[in-house]
């Protein structure tokens, strides 16, 4: 896997569970800003982080691929970070195209938790593009959209993926009007939430495929189909 130090830094911001115990202790003592500006810049092993990240994405793929058929599908990814999962999907399926919606900045003080309006961000879209291309995803197979540019995809999607992002860190309603434009009759969306029952009001079908009781959120991963307009 191609990964440089800048990309490894992004991975640690997006998936902080990959930070080793020693570095976690440093972050706890000196704070996130010091950790982001200095520790993650000089005291990390990009290769090791890349391998752990790839392993994590493979695990995620194994879970969702049991419930979703990606072949010949248009896939929308929201809040997917570096998009390692999309790489794994592409290696195992014949995808039509990925559309990726992400933010293009790193918050000055990264805060993890709930954010109603989706203001928090920790990404750099030029690095996402570099990561995908250098790891074998052809440029014509994906398009990246900056959430804050207000220019979002205007086509229908078969599958929408938003793991540990939509309704996990910010309100689902941020995207609701947009979804009503891009959902087809048989479109499916997969995401993590603590309020699975709520979505029976928005979709014809809501299926819980896994539960994560080991996190603060105690979230459930659900697949929804048939948006109610």
Residue map of PLM features:
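Conserved SAM-binding loop of SAM-dependent methyltransferases across substrates and taxa
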Residues: 82-95, 111-112
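S-adenosyl-L-methionine
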Residues: 115-150
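A short acidic, Gly/Pro-enriched loop at the edge of an enzyme's catalytic core
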Residues: 147-160
